[in-house]
Every structure is written in structure tokens, then in C-alpha cells.
Amino acid sequence: MSPTFYPAARHAFPEVLDLLRRFRRDQTGSYAIITALTMPALLGLVGLGSEVGLWYYNHQHLQSAADSGAISAATTYSIQGNSTGLITQAQAATATYGFVAGANNVVVTLHQPPLSGSYTSTTNAVEVIVSQPQTRLFSSLFSSSQLTISARAVAVGNGGLGCVLSLNTTASGATVIKGTSAVNLSGCSLMDNSSNSSALTLNGGGTLSALSVNVVGNVSGTSNITTTLGINTGATPASDPYADSSYPSFSGCDKHNFSSKKTETINPGVYCGGMSLNAGAHVTLNPGVYYLDQGSLSVNGGATLSGTGVTLVFTSSTGNNYATASVNGGATINLTPPTNGSTAGIVFFGDRNMPVGTGFSFECGASQVLGGALYLPRGAVSFAGGADTTTACTQLVADTITFSGNSNFAINCAGYGTKPIGSRLAKLVE
């Protein structure tokens, strides 16, 4: 608001007004002297404030570069399983932010695992530090020492892509390896979403070899586990990769209580009461979706089941007695999934409405070539007594999983239509 002056006041107090005018004229010189004396300091403070702001701005950019470098290096470690070239990856990432190692005195340092912080014992954690000396301007009036700004970031690789995933979030022994079973996950990881202190349990002489083991809870029996990227407890739960997948609706019955002891080829459709293959059966499935409405897929010793581009759906039109699967000793299975369509990548598809813990068994001695995903999200799956999955691409996703026989998995899944379990992308943790 502007000041207001009143004419009456000027006439009433002329002496006072004249005195004030003379005082103002007398102070003009003093103001000039004070201003001259303080102006350098004021300008210095303004300049110093601007310089500190520039340091803060540079630190923010250094931090972005360090974050990117750590994520890039940790992701590379997750993919290749060793430390080769990690510093090169980190430096390439920081360079995209204008911080080129060796240029303008920029230094990029990498430690794997970190030398400080909460992840010094985490094998797949990578620490990146980016530093650069700053040129002093106004601050040189107060100090001549070198000022270096640094930014630090730590990223943890997620252990690579999974091929075995237990979805149960609370169970003890959501994944169990028992007996003398040897479970080999070639180039892929085991993931267990249970927060239980014994989420993954190895009993007896059972062994596990994997790219990594990622468990939300904890592990019982770590001495029998061999990994490339480490055992990660307290992990972030893995998402259900097929949560958005669905199978087409169905109705009626094309076959009732199908049973075979001979060589034959059958077509997609609804098989009410399931399928039973006995010794002497050599059944080939034409491509498509096979609905097992109640009953069981039973493949007994001496029987062979094969098919390319097939999905077997385990369901129930009544909401009761959901279909299951039982592959017994001496049976042979060779199945691969469709590569497109609503069930792409899925060779076994369990209805999400079936009771939790519905049993699916793959018994000892079975020669199994199961390509794609065994997606049984409510199932209690047992791989038992020497079951051997030799295909290059096998995923097992179930509520709980028990291995009591030798089992092999790999995820060379190009051309199978599968979806990845987990991600190779690392995440920032510090």
C-alpha cells in the first residue's frame, strides 16, 4: 500500500517538516558510505549462495549418474552371473549423464559387494561412487582446500529369471527338497513367496543348484544349496507371471472317462472324467486346448503321451472335484505348449478356483519332456523319485512344490511363448 499524506499536516507543523527534510539531506552521505563498505560482503554472500546452489545442482546430477551406474552394473551381474565388465557398464551409464570417467577429473568407483552400508555381505549388491572436484569461486575467499562432491548408490540384482516359483505366502515348506533328490536349475532361479522362517526347506541329503535362490522368508538347509548369484532372503515377492492369462470358456462333454491302451491320436475338446492312459497306450494330442472336467490325467507305467502346441486345462464345470494329474513310474510324456493365443506358453493350466492344495504328482522314473509352463497356481505339486525334465524350457508355478526326486529345469524359452518369472533388472537399495 502507498503512503498517504494530508495537506493539513503540512500547514500545522512546518518547522517539523523542514527539520525532517534537513535530516534526510544530512544522512545521504552516511548511507553512501555504509553502502560502499557493506556492498562487497553482500555481493560475496550472494555469490556464495549461488555457488552452494551450483554444488547442490551438481550433486543431484552426480547422484542420478551413480544410481544409473549401480543399476546397470547390478543388472549385468544378474544376467551373466559374474563380475566381468561391471565397471565398464557402470562407467557407460554415468557417461550418459555427462560424467565420463577420467574426463574433467571424474572418478567412477565400483565395489561388489559394497564396502559399507547394509549390503556388505550381499553377493549380488553393487556399490557405485561417482566423484568430481569442484572449482571454487566466491568460496575461495574462505578456504583454499579442494572441494570434491561425491554421490553413492547401491543396487541389488534380483537374481535373474526364475523357472520355479512357489506362490504360497505363509506356508512352512512352500518349497521342499527332500530325500536324496538333486534339483538342478540351469541358468535360472528358484523363487519362494512364503514369508515363513522355513519357506524353503532341504531335508536329508537333498541338494539344489541354481542361478540364485530368492525367498521372501528364510531357508532351512542352506549348506546343500549351490548358487551363482547367492541366496537372497527377505526378497521381494515375485509376481505371478500368468495372472492375466485365461483359457477359453467351454461347455458340454466331447469324451467321457477317456481311457486308452493303444496307439491313437485324439483331438482338442472337453474330456469329462479325465483321461487314463495305461500300459501300451501311445496317445498323440493334436494341437489345441484339452479341458479335463473333473477326474484326473493319469499316465501309468508303459504309457506314452505326446503333443505339440497343446494346453491341458484342469477344471470342473460344477465347482467340485477339480481335475488333477498323476504321472506314474515308467510313463513317458513329451508335451509343448501353443506359442500364441490365450494359453500361449502354458502346457498345464490349473483352474484358479480349485481348492488350495489340490494335488498334482509327477512320480519317480517318469521320462518327462514338459516344455513351457506348468501353471498350477492352487496346486500342491510333487516332483518325485527321479522325475527328469530335460527340455530347454520348463517353468513350474504352483502354490507349493515338493521335490523328492532328481529334477532339471532351464529357461531357454525363445519360441515357447512363455512369460518371464521375475526380472533381471536390479533395484536401488541405498
Where are these regions (language model features)?
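Alpha-helical hydrophobic helix detector
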Residues: A36-S50, S64
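Envelope-exposed proteins and targeting segments
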Residues: T122-V126, I149-A151, S186-C188, N267, ...
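Beta-strand-rich extracellular passenger or scaffold domains
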Residues: V164, T170-K178, D192, S198-L202, ...
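Glycine-centered recognition micro-motifs in short, flexible terminal segments and loops
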Residues: E15-M39
